Amino acid sequence: MHSLKFAKNQSKAVCDVRSYDNKDRWIILIDLTTGLFTEIDHQHDEAWIGGPGISGWNADEGTLGWLNDDQTVYFQSEKTGYSHIYLHDTARKYTWQLTEGKWEVYDIVLSKDSKSFYISANRSHPGDRNFLRVDIAAQKTDNITSKEGYHQVVLSPDEKTLAIRFSDKNTPWELYTAVNTTNTTKNRVTYSTTKEFNSYQWRKPDVVTFKGSDEKDIYARLYQPKIGSANKAAVIFVHGAGYLQNAHNYWSNYHREYMFHNLLVDNGFTVLDIDYRASEGYGRDYRTAIYRHMGGRDLQDHLDGKDYLASLGIDSTRVGIYGGSYGGFITLMAMLSTPGEFPCGAALRSVTDWAHYNHEYTSNILNYPDTDPEAYRKSSPIYFAENLQGKLLMLHGMVDDNVQFQDVVRLSQRFIELNKENWELAVFPIEAHGFKESYSWYDEYRRIYELFYTELILKSTK
């Protein structure tokens, strides 16, 4: 049960209640004078409850509150398959949907006069985040910003001015101001990049779609070398977290990898960065497609991405794969559960056995190890160690505070027991899950580059 949201007159409150298995959410109305409560909304998901603006079963609270009339409650739900705003009239006991479409609503702010919501949304393209105003009475949504990229907005107290943190694909975040009006114009305030940074022509990767083997559209970032400089080899990057978006039109959270991808392209490689199944921004079905099988549909999207690269003229026998955290896990599953698909892979800070990872994360997707052992077994790389064929590089910080170092130690021991020879482990003694030292990042990516250059270029020319 999450914290109560009180009406201004203090006579009633609402809160959301979650089942322990995270498959049900109830929003309840509490009469504070009688102590009685009634159900406003019930959401059930055979996989797990989630999505933008929707609370977790832990302390993470979602969108929930009152309009100024002390009668109308607002909340978000994935009822239609995408997270949208809903309103409930507590007097008339009536619920209606305010926003709709195949896009997601984020970061709701109620206007002072309680007549509008300000939201962030990817309505124009899954890879954009624009700032919109939703007129509650008219049920009309207008763009305040509309440019490709990400507009992270804070309203001034009088709601007349916007402070905007904006970026696009090859431009880091900068601060702008704008008037709060439809299709506003931004005024740039900061110029944060250095001469050294600006001296390099950072690429704007194309955001492309290709068809998965189930005919669903898969979004990805595509980095391509100039015609004539391509070496017909490619690298697939797997972002971390699972529920995260990286095939978008703004500056990546993976800025180091973005720079590394530019280096790869400088040397003739093509790079594909896929928003695989379970990535953020694409609705409920996309989010839950990995239920009971991590390394299933999400890994298949990378195999389909490899086929897409082949359609662009890439040699399908010269495609490597790498990623960190969840991306490292997918890399391990690619190398171990689909042997022969990739000649090489680099797995950074990877989970090797989900039964040893934190319960809060895994219980949503795989249920519990004691009640659903099959889901854990088919989703854990350590059970496929005997299948290793390609060259595998594993890299892990010894003081990892997220994916414990024991994960990579156990898989290493399993490789030793199986007499596997085509693997290496690079240990970083002072690093946790997110590396801090520049020399560690350099060492890590030097090793990864050398792996791809050796396995995809040198060996192909012998």
Segments from the language model and where they lie:
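Multi-bladed beta-propeller domains
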Residues: 1, 30-62, 77-78, 88-112, ...
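A conserved hydrophobic secondary-structure block that centers on an alpha-helix together
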Residues: 1-9, 16
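Residue-level detector of Asp-centered blade-edge/turn motifs that repeat once per structural unit
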Residues: 8-9, 68-69, 112-113, 157-158
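Hydrophobic beta-strand positions that form the internal "hydrophobic ladder"
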Residues: 12-15, 73-74, 117, 162
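Hydrophobic helix-coil surface modules that form long, contiguous segments used
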Residues: 15, 23-25, 35-45, 243, ...
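Structural motif
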Residues: 22-29, 81-86, 126-132, 171-177
